Amino acid sequence: GWMLDYPSAEDYLNPLYASSSADGHGSNDGDYKSAEFDKLLNAALAQTDVKKRTEDFTKAQEVLAKDLPVIPLWNDNVAAASATNVKNVSFDYTNLPTYNTITK
């Protein structure tokens, strides 16, 4: 599986689907290559405006959904329980509790 290192779509899209990561040069083990995807990914990577960057990442993901270079077999879920007097229990992008927000 693949675990997110930091909260950005780039952390999945670039190493797993960029043409530059194919042919043994990264984790694109299916050797997926798409000029359209690469163009959108590179546009997102060059973008400094967060909203526009997100739009480019979304468009790149739409190309992946259309091409379907991989078939996801499972997705990580998280479940938790807490006492009724414990508040603000939430989880971060790695599915770990955000301990600094929990209050009693």
Describe each PLM feature range.
Residues G1-W2, Y6, Q47-S82:
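Bilobed periplasmic-binding protein-like "clamshell/Venus-flytrap" ligand-binding domains
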Residues N14-N42, N75-K104:
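Short, solvent-exposed loop/beta-turn-alpha elements that line the ligand-binding surface or hinge
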Residues E10, N14, D29, L41, ...:
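Generic hydrophobic alpha-helical scaffold/packing signal
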Residues G1-G24, D56:
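Periplasmic binding protein-like
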